[in-house]
Amino acid sequence: AGVIVDSEVARAAAEPVLPVRRPLPGFAAHVADAALREEPAAQRHQLTIDRGVQERLERVAKKAAARIGPKVSVAIVLARADTGAILAKAGSADYFDAARAGWIDMARVVRSPGSTLKPFIYGLAFEDGLVMQETTIEDRPANFAGYRPKNFDMEYQGDVSVRQALQLSLNVPAVRLLDTVGPVRLVARMKRGGVTPTLPEGERPGLAIGLGGVGLSLEELVQLYTGLSQRGRVARLHSRADAAAPKPPGEPILSPQAVWQITDILSGVAPPQGAPRLGIAYKTGTSYGYRDAWSVGYDGRHVIGVWVGRPDGGAVPGLTGYLAAAPILFEAFAKSGLGIAPRPRPPAGAVRLARAELPFAQRRFAPSARESADAPVEPAPEIVYPPQGARVDLGLRAGATMPLALKINGGRAPFRWLANGRPVRLSARRRTAAWTPDGAGASTLTVIDAAGRAASVNVFLE
């Protein structure tokens, strides 16, 4: 009593109460969630987030998802390439959008990266002196012990330069180079950059990893690409400003000369339709079945990564990195307000030579001895049960947990199973298996054999 005078009480009581619902604050929600999980007892959290950049990129993500379609989410990560500090991160299109599962931080979810690892394959080839930018390499049908990669458009370009092969993201040339430099070595370089790619349990890295046959998150991809911005030196991503920045990995992921060659090529990739030429270097990727669209770009100071897809792993017909993710990448760079930083000067020993100036051995890349054009191969895998379009009553609506029998013909073990784009732990050697679904509804089942060949069926489980 006596704290507030009667006149003030009367005035406050006379104020009208407006029935207005105000939106919940959702600023940098996924970053805030992570900070609270890491330091739940802390009274104050100091983050590396730049408020202005964060707000602008959250708007970019939300508008892009609405433009692309329902149930689609967008994740964007912007980081300093030299320190790894995350300046902005939208883990989804809208944290409170239940239809897009906005509460899931898609920047940390492991997905297939599509072709976004190809620059590192070419980097190893440059480092080893196997090729230069104008080296001729074949883009023709090839057989690598039963693995027959095809280009995204199912067409072949014939003889192309290494520069063209990377800019066009041709699959066969990338696999040819990976077959020579070695998939185990590629994975080792990723680990050198502080990233551990996810492989099916018990499997060794194979040629398919160059085309997306491995699991990485958007944050991990952005971390790898900091090395392309900084002459091979990778910076570990972090979002806390009130703790010591994590120590960078020791050795460079690639030599400065190899990184310069990659950046020189990727900076010449045409921007997506309607986007301005910003002077950035960038690469796109699309996962198997149109489930994930990626684009990662960088200048001399920042790296931005974009992921587009459905959080439930469902396919989005026509969703590609170039058509869906790249326009968002360019918009994010343009609207970040950070400008475009010049790239480092060419390091000593970095040269760009015409084909006629190359040593004879570097004018054409020779296929490895393991590559064959006509080696016999067993039939591709086929899912014979359940058949395409089947409706299978497992009693799920009544609360039962009956498994679904799976059977395949053809293909070569070991096999990998995916349910709605996510790995399922089943026997890798047997052609029959039993899978217990999470619930009723439509499901897409995919099997991938040792040669990277895949078969899928869409079924409805009841």
What are these regions (language model features)?
Residues I49, V74-A75, I137-A142, D153-P197, ...:
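Active-site-adjacent helix/loop patches that line small-molecule binding or acyl-intermediate pockets
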Residues L47-I68, I76-R80, K89, D97-M106, ...:
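A penicillin-recognizing enzyme superfamily signal
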Residues A1-R51, E55, K150, K191-G202, ...:
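Non-catalytic, structured segments within soluble enzyme domains
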Residues R22-R37, V131-L186, A245-G268:
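Conserved catalytic neighborhood of penicillin-recognizing serine enzymes
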